[in-house]
């Protein structure tokens, strides 16, 4: 099973459904990627910060070696971490990440957060996380413009076919578009019925910037991180509105949540290690929700953001070995 694509402003096609690598276990990552490719997934969304790019690359290499896919059939995404925003750090870390994946280019390389942190040498700690080599939260003076200029050079050097941003506000996008020589192809944001960000989505799409949703299942992604809000918020899978719509269409709650996004041309990047769920998550484009159903799902919005980049737990000192 394959899924439709959306045309990026860079001219490339990006699948509307992909496989996200956040929190994918290193021990199982290669096998998960391999089996996802066999199931029909073509977009894989990784990042330096996830710490599993070497293993992900092994899964890709196995699938290519066995003739299941060719490199050009895949759409591989990775992200620039906060510690590498200085202009002279962008290309070296991109090349390292490409080497980890075993690739010559990324289909899409994204600025992970609009937050520039002090450089951490990969030889000292990789992924670097949020703290400096001094075990503190320390910022770099790199501006987004400096970082973006370096990102554009990745396209010039054919290290990335498209470049994009993540966790940007509309205001930051407006600023970026004033000076960008190469416009961001995508905006990746937390997007689920408890955090719809409708005005941001509308603005990005109006500017020709494709939107990708992460954490499509809302609090579920964050319960294991022991976030208070995630524990206290009703699970979307159990919500009467979602369950009722799922029953009506003969789909699972997960499929309804994903279709709520893809029907509005928003890409999604769920993950699963279960073959049945892998197939179900791909089956979110060939059927439609009614307009009234999309509206009632959107009405669940609470402006509730779970991915807080400055949450206290992320800023705890790293314990000594």
UniProtKB/Swiss-Prot annotation:
Binding site for substrate: 112
Catalysed transformations (reactions): xylitol + NAD(+) = D-xylose + NADH + H(+); xylitol + NADP(+) = D-xylose + NADPH + H(+)
Top-rank lineage group of the source organism: Eukaryota
MF-aspect GO terms: D-xylose reductase (NADPH) activity
Keywords: Carbohydrate metabolism, NAD, NADP, Oxidoreductase, Xylose metabolism
Catalytic-site annotation from UniProt: 50
Pathway per the UniProt entry: Carbohydrate metabolism; D-xylose degradation
Residues binding NAD(+), per UniProt: 166-167, 215-224, 271-281
Record SUPFAM superfamilies: NAD(P)-linked oxidoreductase
Site feature Lowers pKa of active site Tyr, where: 79
InterPro entries linked: AKR, AKR2D, Aldo/ket_reductase_CS, NADP_OxRdtase_dom, NADP_OxRdtase_dom_sf
Entry's EC annotation: 1.1.1.307
Signal peptide annotation: none
Pfam families found in the cross-reference section: Aldo_ket_red (PF00248)
CDD domains: AKR_AKR2D1 (cd19115)
Gene Ontology biological process terms from the UniProt entry: D-xylose catabolic process
Record's function text: Catalyzes the initial reaction in the xylose utilization pathway by reducing D-xylose into xylitol. Xylose is a major component of hemicelluloses such as xylan. Most fungi utilize D-xylose via three enzymatic reactions, xylose reductase (XR), xylitol dehydrogenase (XDH), and xylulokinase, to form xylulose 5-phosphate, which enters pentose phosphate pathway.
The family this protein is said to belong to: Belongs to the aldo/keto reductase family.
This protein's name: Probable NAD(P)H-dependent D-xylose reductase xyl1
Protein source organism: Neosartorya fischeri (strain ATCC 1020 / DSM 3700 / CBS 544.65 / FGSC A1164 / JCM 1740 / NRRL 181 / WB 181) (Aspergillus fischerianus)
The encoding gene: xyl1
């Amino acid at each position: 099973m394959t899924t439709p694509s959306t045309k990026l402003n860079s001219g490339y096609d990006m699948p509307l459904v992909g496989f996200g690598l956040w929190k994918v276990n290193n021990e199982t990552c290669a096998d998960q990627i391999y089996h996802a490719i066999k199931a029909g997934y073509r977009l894989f969304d990784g990042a330096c910060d996830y710490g599993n790019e070497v293993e992900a690359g092994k899964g890709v290499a196995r699938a290519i070696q066995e003739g299941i896919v060719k490199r050009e059939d895949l759409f591989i995404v990775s992200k620039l971490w906060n510690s590498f925003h200085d202009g002279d750090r962008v290309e070296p870390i991109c090349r390292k990440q490409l080497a980890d994946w075993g690739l010559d280019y990324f289909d899409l390389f994204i600025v992970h957060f609009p937050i520039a942190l002090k450089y951490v040498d990969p030889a000292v700690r990789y992924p670097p996380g949020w703290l400096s080599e001094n075990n503190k939260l320390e910022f770099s003076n790199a501006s987004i413009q400096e970082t973006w200029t370096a990102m554009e050079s990745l396209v010039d050097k054919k290290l990335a076919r498209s470049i994009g941003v993540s966790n940007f506000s509309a205001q930051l996008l407006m600023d970026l578009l004033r000076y960008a020589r190469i416009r961001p192809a995508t905006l990746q944001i937390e997007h689920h019925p408890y955090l719809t960000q409708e005005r941001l989505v509308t603005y990005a799409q109006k500017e020709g910037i494709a939107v990708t949703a992460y954490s499509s299942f809302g609090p579920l992604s964050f319960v294991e991180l022991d976030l208070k809000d995630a524990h206290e918020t009703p699970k979307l899978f159990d919500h009467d509105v979602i369950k009722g719509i799922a029953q009506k269409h003969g789909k699972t709650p997960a499929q309804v949540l994903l279709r709520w996004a893809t029907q509005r041309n928003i890409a999604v990047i769920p993950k699963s290690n279960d073959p049945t769920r892998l197939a179900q998550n791909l089956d979110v484009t060939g059927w439609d929700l009614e307009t009234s159903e999309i509206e009632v799902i959107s009405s669940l919005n609470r402006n509730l953001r779970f991915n807080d980049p400055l949450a206290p737990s992320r800023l705890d000192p790293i314990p000594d070995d």
